[in-house]
Amino acid sequence: MNYKDFQNRVDHGMQMFDAGNIQAALEIFTALVNSDISDIDKSSMCLNIAVVYDKLGNVQQSLEWYARAIQYEKPHCRFEAQEYLATYLKQIDRPREALKILDSLMASTHLSEADKVRVRENIEQLKVEINKPVYRRPGA
């Protein structure tokens, strides 16, 4: 697929999503995942699909598509999908799982120094959130 065709399809999928035509967006992004685009672009389309499923309230499907995105990017020493998954896990109140992902990223040798700083900052924020005391009213 040439780049212009790819970009037109992505744009169309985004327009469908923004217009609330979720099914059309899913079909477009899924077709792109099943096409001859690069693994990195397939990973990005999986991330788009994960966002669509989250919008539909289907957390399990969303998590499955994040996992697929990670599988496409991992052989290429990329980690964008892992960071997005960690962010999503934090949003759905699963900070410990997010922390595990970011900790595993720090152990990898393919992070740039700037990446390490960003990931460390995210780890520290998660640790603060995890260790934040929870106050409950007596008898509640």
State the predicted function of each range.
Residues 5-35:
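Alpha-helical segment of the N-proximal tetratricopeptide repeat
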Residues 3-4, 40, 76, 114:
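Residue signature of alpha-solenoid helical repeat architecture, marking inter-repeat boundaries
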Residues 90-113, 124:
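TPR/TPR-like (Sel1-like) alpha-helical repeat modules
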